[in-house]
Amino acid sequence: MSRYVFTSESVTEGHPDKICDQVSDAVLDALLAQDPSSRVACETVVNTGLCLITGEVTSNAQVDFIHLVRNVIREIGYSGARAGGFDATSCAVLVALDQQSPDIAQGVNEADDHSGDPLDKVGAGDQGIMFGYACDETPELMPLPISLAHRLARQLAAVRHDGSLSYLLPDGKTQVSVVYENDRPVAIDTILISTQHTSEVEGISDENGIRERITQDLWTHVVEPATADLPLKPNREATRFLVNPTGKFVVGGPQGDAGLTGRKIIVDTYGGYARHGGGAFSGKDPTKVDRSAAYAARFVAKCLVAAGLAQRAEVQLSYAIGVAKPVSILVESFGTGKVTNDELTALVQDHFDLRPGAIIEQFKLRQLPQQRGGRFYQDTAAYGHFGRPDLKLPWEDVTDKASTLLQAEAQQQKQGSSL
């Protein structure tokens, strides 16, 4: 019997890097909402008293970027007396956006393909490799450690926003260690929560007293509600529960650490449980395959698992800049497949159109901000891009395609047995 512990982390929306992801995606939303053909590569930097947005944009949209940035920062919770050295109203906002390089644009606008299919004319915006993953550990077909870490981070933010724990401040991190036996989760070994807080907590000022109070409150108001509907729950006696191990966490957010777009790519995906191609998502329009193809790879992997063709599936895609069709497609089922990896790969090649133009069209990636009232990508920028039933993400809706795959596999097996 194999036994091991696997750990994943998440962060709250007030973490400096996540502030940047949300600002970058808010810029993307604003541009696509007005001009769905906008080309966007927006990077954000924050530190004490400063937010800088930079990158490349080609768009007909007219956006007040400074007003937009301040609204995002304010919504996260950095405003007024509780801003902690980074205030939406008073921080400097610098905008340094250029136009997209014409050399990149020509490859996307007119792919190196001479077929009559218009989708063949939309080339990948860059070279790269992307991975998608799914497994049957949770209802949303995500690995349990990252799913739990996100649940805790969302609940931590929720009790701050609703005032249940009024001493909490925006910055925070969660980490969950899960015990596996024979590759199945059997227990929650450790939960770690680091959360920013006021210098006094409900009249308590000594460090030990503050930590004891926060520990008690977080178990009651965060851990228990976040895990209440799960079959595998933490146990107050058996699960190690660590809170602010350094003792206190008063200075946080951009006052404590600089933040940058794209530095939480493992939090955004599978918590380290699956491989990652290295490309970040936030601030990038759908022609960037770092984003759109990673969404498609997740869709494919989830379809395979939802169809019962594998308990675990990892899909690798690769692209060349200016070329529409993927350079390669590979499926790995880690020995859990109903059929071989080669057969799974063949099913994917036959039933999924993974050209960038087709991915964009299938998921309506350019239209989503307009369809969702001017805001879509910003909400994916915190608490993960996958396994989010709260957001109704199109790449998570696999019911119809999974059924098609199952029928195709059954037909394939029937034909094979008749030979």
Curated annotation (Swiss-Prot):
A single Gene Ontology CC term: cytoplasm
Cofactor note: Binds 2 divalent ions per subunit. Binds 1 potassium ion per subunit.
Region of interest (Flexible loop), ranges: 100-110
Catalysis performed (reactions): L-methionine + ATP + H2O = S-adenosyl-L-methionine + phosphate + diphosphate
PROSITE patterns: ADOMET_SYNTHASE_1 (PS00376), ADOMET_SYNTHASE_2 (PS00377)
EC number(s) stated in the UniProt entry for this protein: 2.5.1.6
Keywords of the record: ATP-binding, Cytoplasm, Magnesium, Metal-binding, Nucleotide-binding, One-carbon metabolism, Potassium, Transferase
Residues involved in K(+) binding: 43
Subcellular location: Cytoplasm
GO annotation, biological process: one-carbon metabolic process; S-adenosylmethionine biosynthetic process
Domain of life: Bacteria
Statement: the UniProt record of this protein carries the keyword Magnesium: yes
Predominant subcellular localization, coarse grouping: cytoplasm
GO molecular function, one term: methionine adenosyltransferase activity
Pathway connected to this protein: Amino-acid biosynthesis; S-adenosyl-L-methionine biosynthesis; S-adenosyl-L-methionine from L-methionine: step 1/1
Cofactor(s) demanded: Mg(2+); K(+)
Binding of Mg(2+), residues: 17
Record keyword Kinase present: no
Residues where L-methionine binds: 56, 100, 257, 288
Pfam families according to UniProt: S-AdoMet_synt_C, S-AdoMet_synt_M, S-AdoMet_synt_N
Residues making up the signal peptide according to the UniProt record: none
Functional note: Catalyzes the formation of S-adenosylmethionine (AdoMet) from methionine and ATP. The overall synthetic reaction is composed of two sequential steps, AdoMet formation and the subsequent tripolyphosphate hydrolysis which occurs prior to release of AdoMet from the enzyme.
Assembly behavior: Homotetramer; dimer of dimers.
Name of this protein: S-adenosylmethionine synthase
Source organism of the structure: Prochlorococcus marinus (strain MIT 9313)
